């Protein structure tokens, strides 16, 4: 059956040539990212368990994780957590298949603890956090849509859409890599906490990076040491960012600090969830790891949704894969925007529409790019099982 794929030229100024660009990334230890990470890891763990027990993935969605912030008393040299943060694991999962019961709660709790151990090095799992599992069972109608597809192309669980684009702009790449660079510096500067937010503003040819980094108090002796450490971090990030662009880069960090009064951003655990910052799945980065107001975005939470028929997950990841390949393989294309829309109950390989919009380089005609862009889109839609496998194996980021 022929798919409804529409390829058209999009006439607009490419983001790289716009005067103002804003890009954000919430880092690994930001409460929203922690919620995303736990949700996705639980989904992946359930997929593994279902496949081992039943030979296929059963219905589940674990995309409703909530983090309620605790209270702490940070202090130079080491403070204390007064009230632990509370993490509520919710969502839906198949608990019984035939006469076999799946230990969903045990899997979810173990997976959440393992993720926290990896994501937040200074978090004491025994005293700094309470994890509660309230994952329920799925609704009968959605489970039926899921189960009827055991040996066929999955049917969409919802009428929804996914959005992707390529390539990343220079500012987008710098914002993303800034958080990665900060994480890599932890071995040398252990005071760097994992709760990082990078806000990038490009105004004409100047890129401003505003960084919030939760510093870990036990590794900082006093206010002078804090100021010195902060200066060292800014210098490292400035050098890294400047190496990626010919534009001028201005880096500032923890701009809410008041050095005169000694009010600075230090934490006990390296995350603001210890003292007032709640978190939830879907409130942070989009599927490509960024928040990009200059680009089309879907508000769907990608993390934690099942990778078999939940189009809120599959189409967002698929759209980015399609856009990336078109941008890399089709000559004359400056930007690619992909939107894929489903209809509930219809095969996910047959979307209601797959829209591919191409911003072409000067002098390039749509006719030279149309066929190849359509062929790439069609092939990826045919190969959705490959996307599912990439999700199973953790090859695609969701936040």
Swiss-Prot record:
Binding site for ATP: 136-141
Pathway(s) annotated for this protein in UniProt: Amino-acid biosynthesis; S-adenosyl-L-methionine biosynthesis; S-adenosyl-L-methionine from L-methionine: step 1/1
A Gene Ontology molecular function term of the record: ATP binding
EC numbers on record: 2.5.1.6
NCBIfam families attached to this UniProt entry: PRK04439.1-3, PRK04439.1-5
Function: Catalyzes the formation of S-adenosylmethionine from methionine and ATP.
The name this protein goes by in its record: S-adenosylmethionine synthase
Gene responsible for this protein: mat
């Amino acid at each position: 059956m022929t798919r409804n794929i529409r390829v058209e030229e999009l006439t607009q100024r490419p983001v790289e040539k716009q005067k103002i660009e804003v890009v954000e990334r919430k880092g690994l230890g930001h409460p929203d990212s922690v919620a995303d990470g736990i949700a996705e890891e639980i989904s992946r763990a359930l997929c593994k368990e279902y496949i081992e027990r039943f030979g296929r993935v059963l219905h589940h969605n674990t995309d409703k994780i909530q983090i309620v912030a605790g209270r702490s008393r940070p202090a130079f040299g080491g403070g204390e957590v007064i009230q632990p943060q509370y993490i509520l694991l919710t969502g839906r999962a198949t608990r019984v298949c035939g006469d076999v019961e799946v230990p969903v709660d045990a899997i979810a709790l173990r997976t959440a603890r393992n993720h926290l151990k990896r994501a937040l090095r200074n978090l004491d799992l025994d005293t700094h956090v309470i994890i509660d599992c309230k994952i329920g069972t799925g609704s009968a109608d959605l489970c039926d849509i899921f189960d009827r597809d055991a040996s066929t192309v999955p049917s969409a669980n919802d009428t929804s859409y996914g959005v992707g684009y390529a390539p990343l702009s220079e500012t987008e790449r710098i914002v993303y890599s800034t958080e990665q660079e900060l994480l890599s510096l932890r071995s040398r500067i252990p005071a760097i906490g994992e709760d990082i937010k990078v806000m990038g503003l490009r105004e004409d040819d100047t890129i401003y990076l505003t960084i919030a980094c939760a510093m870990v108090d036990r590794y900082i002796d006093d206010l002078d040491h804090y100021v010195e450490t902060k200066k060292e971090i800014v210098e490292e990030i400035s050098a890294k960012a400047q190496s990626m662009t010919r534009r001028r880069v201005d880096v500032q960090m923890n701009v809410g600090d008041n050095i005169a009064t000694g009010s600075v951003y230090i934490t006990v655990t390296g995350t603001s969830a210890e003292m007032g910052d709640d978190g939830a799945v879907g409130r942070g980065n989009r599927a490509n790891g960024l928040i990009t107001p200059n680009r089309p975005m879907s508000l769907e939470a990608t993390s934690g949704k099942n990778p078999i028929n939940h189009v809120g997950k599959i189409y967002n990841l698929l759209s980015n894969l399609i856009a990336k390949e078109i941008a890399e393989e089709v000559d004359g294309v400056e930007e690619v925007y992909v939107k894929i829309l489903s209809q509930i109950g219809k095969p996910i390989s047959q979307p209601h529409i797959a829209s591919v919009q191409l911003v072409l380089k000067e002098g390039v005609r749509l006719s030279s790019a149309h066929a190849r862009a359509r062929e790439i889109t069609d092939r990826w839609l045919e190969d959705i099982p490959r996307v599912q496998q990439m999700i199973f194996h953790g090859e695609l980021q969701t936040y």
